[in-house]
Amino acid sequence: MSDRKNVLFVVGKSSAVKELEEFASCNADRANVKIEIVENIGLATDGPLYSAILSGFGADDNVSCDLNLLPTYTTLLTAGGTLIAKTDVGTEDALVKRMKLCGFLNVAKSESVPGVVVGNMPTYKVGSSDKVTLNPEMKENVVSAWKLDDNNSETISEDDLLEADDLIKPDSSSLRVCATTKKAKACKDCSCGLAEELEANRLKDTPKPDTSNAKSSCGSCYLGDAFRCASCPYLGMPAFRPGEKVQLAGNLLQDDF
């Protein structure tokens, strides 16, 4: 305890105060010793002042370290301060666990004195901040890893990605779409003229059948539809004279829709 550190003794009986005062006077050149009874320790308002706290070491003290006092000890100890607590033999593990939960570090049972547990406060204060120093060489290596060597990179021409069919311009007729559906298919009630245009293109591409040698099997075709059968090639045409040459339409036997 060099440099006259502040030490706090916590005892359970007032009878132990006198003996500890004699100890304090003998070591006054080494430490500032203060003695408190356990009933009064909760009233202490000294703040983080003590470098070490010894609890339950009075000669006539039969009271073990009160676990409920540990949070108070953390407020009285300075950063890195030491708590030496005495408890009943066999209950050291419970004290070790409670001290760890209160934030003490390096908590361990004494190997020389049974029933004694020692722990240290962290070297930092709650809410304190510290500067984090980064390795500049590591940062430079990370940046250089993403640099590209232009000499080794291969570029692909955009024209090489196109096929021969991609270079052909589409016909304007194939781009015609319905004003309603925006598709190259006429809607049911098409009024934009796409249906008529598609029908005209279909009829244009449909080969016309040869009807020059068409003959009637019943002999009544020239009389009109009233005398024609259901499969008559002249169905729907006006009556004509017998033997007259009639040119049939190219959409014969095809649906009107």
UniProtKB/Swiss-Prot annotation:
Its cofactor is [2Fe-2S] cluster; [4Fe-4S] cluster. GO terms for biological process: iron-sulfur cluster assembly. GO terms for molecular function: 2 iron, 2 sulfur cluster binding; 4 iron, 4 sulfur cluster binding; electron transfer activity; metal ion binding. Keywords: 2Fe-2S, 4Fe-4S, Cytoplasm, Iron, Iron-sulfur, Metal-binding, Mitochondrion. One of its GO terms (cellular component) is mitochondrial intermembrane space. [2Fe-2S] cluster binds at C178, C187, C190, C192. A motif (Cx2C motif 2) lies at residues 229-232. [4Fe-4S] cluster binds at C218, C221, C229, C232. Residues 178-192 are annotated as: Fe-S binding site A. Residues 1-134 are annotated as: N-terminal SAM-like domain. It comes from the Eukaryota. Coiled coil: none annotated. It is found in: Cytoplasm; Mitochondrion intermembrane space. Residues 218-232 are annotated as: Fe-S binding site B. A motif (Cx2C motif 1) lies at residues 218-221. Residues 135-168 are annotated as: Linker. The keyword DNA repair does not apply. The C-terminal domain binds 2 Fe-S clusters but is otherwise mostly in an intrinsically disordered conformation. Monomer. Belongs to the anamorsin family. This is Anamorsin homolog.
